[in-house]
């Protein structure tokens, strides 16, 4: 009797959930007005545009400007976000990044603009307003990302396979609460799929005990493209933004107040003294490095390594797999892994991202690499859901990023090991810390909330400093980022019509460059060499041609990935690409999508860049080897790389 009652209760719950879901789906989706996209016939189509200031011009700014209003250390998501916010308010901004934009944590995310569905469960069961506030903040900022960078951010359905009947209403109600909390910012209504529909959508799933699936919606985006876009947007608004500029020392007055920094151009070795009214530490997991310099009376870095006091670091690993590991337009969420985490399996850039792990660290490494244990853990979790064997050889790439939780450093005694479980005062969101010297440190948070973090940071700067000028209010909620102007949903179709290029290339350019894609295709159309994939740029072959009689002509089938010489030249001219690694790992995502293909491309990319920059052989060899070393740490066994065949000709 009990089993019958229980089954009927579950069926009733499912029916009620279905009715609620159907009603909300109708009101939220069917009745929602269709978005107004640009009419391609009347939308400006930019085929030429003056490039932004050269690196040399930006370096001259550093020498000529006696004092900046704001100096930002760090060129990741937060730093470039602050640069955009401050420059659009009318402040004179300088940003310095030690290596390249998004070279660390900001390039190694799960690629989700998400509302924090993980925090929602805690908010409900712990009755935690703080957790609920995190969800509301993230949902608001998710909507802002989708609006301000429409070419880089898209809506992605997430499927939760359910293998126990009682979990169906549990997960569905949770998804509906997520919709309700989002309110007008909700992307699409959550819904339930039957077992049959679930398997039809995701035939790779093991359906032996499958009952149904729940689907909610979040955002997906390209993190390094977003980071580069923010840097270029800041420059477009008057900021001086420089990669490969390392801060070696903080400059202080006699009364121990910050006046600026001593920085070195890592390309030339030249030092610059840069003065500023205010200094922002936006170095993410490396925040403590700058705080240690700030604590020194001379602004020097410490001579011995210290435990981080503000950042509580943990390492998160992701792997990339072939596209058949996940449906092409819907992600999969494992809500409870063997170690009580959540794990995502997401379609991204034609591949599948799986992750992430969570391993506490006592220090913050530079460019960490994934361990084999972490890779195997992810594959083991994935195997629980799939009908076919998960093969280690299918791992195309893997990466390890540092996830910074933060705390008030003034509450942490020096020498406290962050792995000892001392979590008192730990902040689950971002945290702004003001030093007595005037240094403002912003750390923590996540990609989705970068804009709000930047707004709060600039608000604090304006509160604490007299910049001697009238300033605008925050502009970034409505500011369309570079490439988002005049972009519309079917932009790739216009690129195909205008330039007669393959669909895959058109989609790649429109989804990563938006309305600036025509600038790349103008370069593409200029010469046959510019049409080559970068993997073949150092070979004696011709560009794609209709002349089938040419035995050296490359067919479009040779484009394993849609990255061309034209895109490389554009990134050098418009996006401050300085090394082969910049292009292969951050301007494009080839190293993250397929490490083997990226290694094959090193020679071609280096060949083109040598011609563009006029490098000597020693510089060329050094930068090519740096790229190989970087790619070699991306989770693919070294014995599978034949490095010699990829050396620069």
Curated annotation (Swiss-Prot):
Its EC number is 1.1.5.3. It comes from the Eukaryota. It catalyses: a quinone + sn-glycerol 3-phosphate = dihydroxyacetone phosphate + a quinol. InterPro entries: DAO_C (IPR031656), DAO_C_sf (IPR038299), FAD-dep_OxRdtase (IPR006076), FAD/NAD-bd_sf (IPR036188), G3P_DH_FAD-dep (IPR000447). FAD binds at residues 69-97. It is found in: Mitochondrion. Pfam families: DAO, DAO_C. Keywords: FAD, Flavoprotein, Mitochondrion, Oxidoreductase, Transit peptide. GO terms for cellular component: mitochondrion. GO terms for molecular function: glycerol-3-phosphate dehydrogenase (quinone) activity. One of its GO terms (biological process) is glycerol catabolic process. Its main location: mitochondrion. It is an enzyme of class 1 (oxidoreductase). Its cofactor is FAD. Pathway: Polyol metabolism; glycerol degradation via glycerol kinase pathway; glycerone phosphate from sn-glycerol 3-phosphate (anaerobic route): step 1/1. Belongs to the FAD-dependent glycerol-3-phosphate dehydrogenase family. This is Glycerol-3-phosphate dehydrogenase, mitochondrial. It comes from Schizosaccharomyces pombe (strain 972 / ATCC 24843).
């Amino acid at each position: 009797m009990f089993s019958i009652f229980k089954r009927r209760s579950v069926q009733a719950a499912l029916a009620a959930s279905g009715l609620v879901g159907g009603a909300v789906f109708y009101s939220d989706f069917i009745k929602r007005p269709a978005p107004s996209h640009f009419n391609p016939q009347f939308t400006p189509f930019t085929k030429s545009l003056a490039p932004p200031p050269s690196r040399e011009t930006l370096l001259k700014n550093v020498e000529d400007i006696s004092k900046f209003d704001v100096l930002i250390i760090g060129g990741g998501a937060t730093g470039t976000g602050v640069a955009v916010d401050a420059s659009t308010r009318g402040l004179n901004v300088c940003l310095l990044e030690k290596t390249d934009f998004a070279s660390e944590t900001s390039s190694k995310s799960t690629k989700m603009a998400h509302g924090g569905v993980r925090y929602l469960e805690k908010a409900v069961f712990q009755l935690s307003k703080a957790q609920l506030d995190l969800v509301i903040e993230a949902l608001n900022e998710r909507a802002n990302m989708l609006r301000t960078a429409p070419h880089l951010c898209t809506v992605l359905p997430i499927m939760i396979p359910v293998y126990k009947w009682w979990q169906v209403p549990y997960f569905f109600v949770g998804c509906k609460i997520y919709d309700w909390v989002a309110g007008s910012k909700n992307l699409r209504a959550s819904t339930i799929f039957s077992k049959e529909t679930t398997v039809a959508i995701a035939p790779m799933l093991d359906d032996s005990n499958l009952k149904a699936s729940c689907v909610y919606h979040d955002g997906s985006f390209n993190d390094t493209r977003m980071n580069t876009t923010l840097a270029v947007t800041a420059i477009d608004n008057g900021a001086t933004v420089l990669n490969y500029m390392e801060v070696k020392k903080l400059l202080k007055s006699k009364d121990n107040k910050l006046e600026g920094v001593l920085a070195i151009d890592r390309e030339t070795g030249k030092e610059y003294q840069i003065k500023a009214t205010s200094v922002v530490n936006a170095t993410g997991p490396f925040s403590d490095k700058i705080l240690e310099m700030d604590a020194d009376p001379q602004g020097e870095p410490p001579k011995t390594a210290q435990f981080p006091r503000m950042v509580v670091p943990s390492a998160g690993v992701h792997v990339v797999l072939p596209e058949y590991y996940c449906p092409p337009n819907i992600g999969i969420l494992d809500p409870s892994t063997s170690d009580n985490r959540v794990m995502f399996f997401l379609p991204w850039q034609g591949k599948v991202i799986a992750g992430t792990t969570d391993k506490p660290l006592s220090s913050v490494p530079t460019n960490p690499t994934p361990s084999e244990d972490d890779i195997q853990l992810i594959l083991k979790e994935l195997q629980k859901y799939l009908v076919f064997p998960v093969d280690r050889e299918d791992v195309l790439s893997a990466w390890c990023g540092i996830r910074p939780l933060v705390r008030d450093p003034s509450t942490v005694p020096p020498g406290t090991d962050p792995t000892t479980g001392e979590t008192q005062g730990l902040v689950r969101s971002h945290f702004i810390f003001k030093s007595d010297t005037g240094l403002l440190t912003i750390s923590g948070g996540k990609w989705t909330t970068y804009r709000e973090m930047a707004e709060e940071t600039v608000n604090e700067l304006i509160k604490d400093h007299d910049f001697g000028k009238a300033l605008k209010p925050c502009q970034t909620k409505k500011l369309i980022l570079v490439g988002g102007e005049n972009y519309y949903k079917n932009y790739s179709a216009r690129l195909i019509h205008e330039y007669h290029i393959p669909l895959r290339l058109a989609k790649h350019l429109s989804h990563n460059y938006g309305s600036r894609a025509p600038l790349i295709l103008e370069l593409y159309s200029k010469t046959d060499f510019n049409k080559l994939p970068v993997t073949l740029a150092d070979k004696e072959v011709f560009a794609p041609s209709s002349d089938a009689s040419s035995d050296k002509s490359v067919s479009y089938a040779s484009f394993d990935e849609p990255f061309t010489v034209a895109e490389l030249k554009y990134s050098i001219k418009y996006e401050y690409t300085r090394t082969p690694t910049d292009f292969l790992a951050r301007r494009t995502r080839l190293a993250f999508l397929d490490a083997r293909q990226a290694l094959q491309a090193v020679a071609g990319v280096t060949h083109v860049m040598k011609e563009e920059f006029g490098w000597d052989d020693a510089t060329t060899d050094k930068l090519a080897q740096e790229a190989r070393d970087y790619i070699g740490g991306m989770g693919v066994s070294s014995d599978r790389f034949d490095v010699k065949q990829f050396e620069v000709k």
